[in-house]
Amino acid sequence: GAIVNITSIAGHMIHPFAGSAYSISKSALSALTRELANEMAALDVRVNAVAPGEIETDMVQPEYEALIPRIPLNRMGAPGDVAGTVYYLCSDDSAYVTGTEVWITGGQHLF
């Protein structure tokens, strides 16, 4: 089986719009992902996470446009960018992947 947690870029770096409660919760989920990957391996369950950056959803406000210059791919992500990665982590193509957090940030996490 496979578990994929949804964390955030805000769990790893200061984000101008996230706030402390959100950031702390996502950081904790990152740690939980690693711990569960170790604990669930004996049950043949892989546990991974995805850490999206700016994704175009209803949660995104107009002020987020100011963040685009800090994204090397020069755009916000689309929901499909996240969904495709989650699908991969649930598939047999990632049968030897566990305890990993995949950044879906367009490179924003580099800065």
Where are these regions (language model features)?
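Short C-terminal tail/terminal secondary-structure segment
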Residues: 13, 66, 87, 98-111
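Non-catalytic, hydrophobic alpha-helical segments
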Residues: 82-83, 89
